[in-house]
Amino acid sequence: MQSINQYVWIIPLLPCLTAVILGLGLISTKNATKSQRLGSAILSIGALLVTMLLSITVLWEQVISDSAYRQLVSWIKVDNLFLEIGCLVDPLSAIMLVLVTTVGVLVMIYTHGYMSHDQGYVRFFAYLSLFTASMLGLVLSPNLVQVYAFWELVGMCSYLLVGFWFTRPSAAYACQKAFITNRVGDFGLLLGILALYWLTGSLEFDIVASRAHQLLVENSANTVLLTVCCVLLFLGPIAKSAQFPLHVWLPDAMEGPTPISALIHAATMVAAGVYLVARLLPLFQEVPLVMDIVAWTGGITAVLGATVALAQKDLKKGLAYSTMSQLGYMILALGVGSYQAGLFHLITHAYSKALLFLGSGSVIHGIEPVVGYNPNQSQNMTYMGGLRSYMPITGVTFLIGTLSLCGVPPFACFWSKDEILADAWHKLPVLGLLAWLTAGLTAFYMFRMYFITFEGTFRGSSLISNKSSKQTLSVNKMDSVFALSNQTKDNTSLKASKHLDPHESSNAMTIPLIVLTIPTILIGFIGAPLPNGLTGSSLLSHWLYLDNTEIVELSTNGWTEFAITALPSVSIGILGAFIAWIVYGPHVDRLKNNPVSIDPSAEGWTGILLNSIYNWSLRRAYIDEIYDQTFVWATRSSANALAWFDQWTIDGIVNVGGLFTLLGGEGTRYTESGRTSAYIFVLGIGLVFVMIAAVLFNFFHL
């Protein structure tokens, strides 16, 4: 029986062909009929379902064989330049294949319900299929050249999907911001690839690290140059995985449809940066300074994302900053050498965050008939509350995702996050402390989102009613959701409202939510400690490991030691959730002058401190404002100066030359009298001037 690995190239090909077919259909048909829309969904979901089954087969063969497979084809061979393309199948790529396809299938099913009334329904499925093909091609790439090609395709798909509703100015701005910010990282990645090839003469993942090690041992390579090369390579993951300081594009990318937020900006594309760091980890470990840079970048990003998420009012943007923080956890783990923990958290977080994003989409879809289709209202948690009674499936599944992300046992993210904390404490205690504090912040802001959205009373109807009667409650000027609750607590009865009630989403949207709860609950057990008597610490550690690298592992003496190790992370998570319940629980209507809000009457150092933290979080740590006042302002000023120079200098010279030519032509036109005698007279005058010039040149010996 032939190995399935020989046909692994079919995996990215199927969704690619689907995208081509749908694209040709869009070109040939202006307005898709109902049957064509349904056909595009069936084709996209069916192709990706087959791809998912193939990916699961590849993963199973990797598990039982425990051997990598590589298939290469010569692409370019010119003198000393020899490049190949092909497929690389190992435990890392096999896991990513299953991750992308399983989440992708559920997102496409969800999309059928979420985008059912959108005019761009077929176009959306075409973009989804193209992105899936690009992502699958990226994880199967055996070298950096092929990675870069698919890396750019993934970025292009993100641009198209973030700006899917391009007639909306905010969406058009968001896709440009995402594209330009990622170009900074991609340029660094390209320079790093070129420098690495110049140093090692190869771009194959399994060769560059060994050659770099050999060059360092033989003192044939400059350590500084190799460090710069690795840092340039790391710029690509910094931008793609929304790490500080190139993270600013991710929250704005929430302008795209919610299924995209779940697939691209939570589970797959943003994880591509983590994947590339994992691939390059043997190379990075040759330079300890680079590992420290990676670790500190992840640690700072984790804390920054968590603090900024504390006061966000937009549900999707709050989840975006949460994603940024969790990606920081993964980068931190890889930076301290914990290869398994970083990738383990990538897996658990992908399913949990996909569940949360799809749940947020269900919430938005359910309240839009009540509050309107403006995202400033339908995504604003201020307009929500009490939705668990109207949307029970969405509420329960969102709570499961929240429990997982907060690290509550036995949900998936508990196992991976706890392993990261333990390894960080062991290698860099300062970063371990930051990661531990981030765990508490994560529990606080996630339960804050849950309580504001699903508990209490629904506030949307009363707000819309007050707006329609010109008694507008300005959300932008509200100090917090508490002030909003205090002002609307006497007018939140849905029965008296003339508006529709929030409603649960269709089966096409709720079934993926229910299915995603299964891995959110169970998949963490693949990394759970094994009972005494078995070697190793988990099932995952027997299979997903990195050769020739220092992996931080703690001794495993059973569940007792594990429970003691996990106690600090669970404790601070419970503390964060408890504080969120006190501040944002169902009883918030009874609270007055809550110090967490921006209360003008707040006095003392406590009020000043809390208000400063609130402003820091609400205004995104002022980073976007700083960038606008520096890089954006400088770029626009330079562009305006160049435009002025082009208009008045470059164009001015050309225009003046044209003006003189015009005047000369007009003047010459009047000498055209048609008389031969006049022409002879002018010719004679010219000859006289020529003779005078010749005499002068001869006399003065010029």
From Swiss-Prot:
* Main EC class the enzyme belongs to: translocase
Q: Where are the transmembrane segments?
A: 7-27, 40-60, 91-111, 124-144, 147-167, 189-209, 224-244, 258-278, 289-309, 327-347, 354-374, 395-415, 427-447, 511-531, 562-582, 680-700
What coarse category fits the chief subcellular location reported for this protein?
plastid
GO BP terms, alphabetized: ATP synthesis coupled electron transport; electron transport coupled proton transport
The terms under GO molecular function for this entry are:
NADH dehydrogenase (ubiquinone) activity; quinone binding
Q: What is its EC number?
A: 7.1.1.-
Per UniProt, the keywords (alphabetical) are: Chloroplast, Membrane, NAD, NADP, Plastid, Plastoquinone, Quinone, Thylakoid, Translocase, Transmembrane, Transmembrane helix, Transport
Q: Which domain of life is it from?
A: Eukaryota
* Cellular location(s): Plastid, Chloroplast thylakoid membrane
Name the reaction it catalyses: a plastoquinone + NADH + (n+1) H(+)(in) = a plastoquinol + NAD(+) + n H(+)(out); a plastoquinone + NADPH + (n+1) H(+)(in) = a plastoquinol + NADP(+) + n H(+)(out)
Gene Ontology cellular component annotations, sorted alphabetically: chloroplast thylakoid membrane
- Membrane topology term: Multi-pass membrane protein
Q: What does the function comment of this entry state? A: NDH shuttles electrons from NAD(P)H:plastoquinone, via FMN and iron-sulfur (Fe-S) centers, to quinones in the photosynthetic chain and possibly in a chloroplast respiratory chain. The immediate electron acceptor for the enzyme in this species is believed to be plastoquinone. Couples the redox reaction to proton translocation, and thus conserves the redox energy in a proton gradient.
Q: How does it assemble?
A: NDH is composed of at least 16 different subunits, 5 of which are encoded in the nucleus.
* Family stated for the protein in its record: Belongs to the complex I subunit 5 family.
Question: What is the recorded name of this protein?
Answer: NAD(P)H-quinone oxidoreductase subunit 5, chloroplastic
Gene for this protein?
ndhF
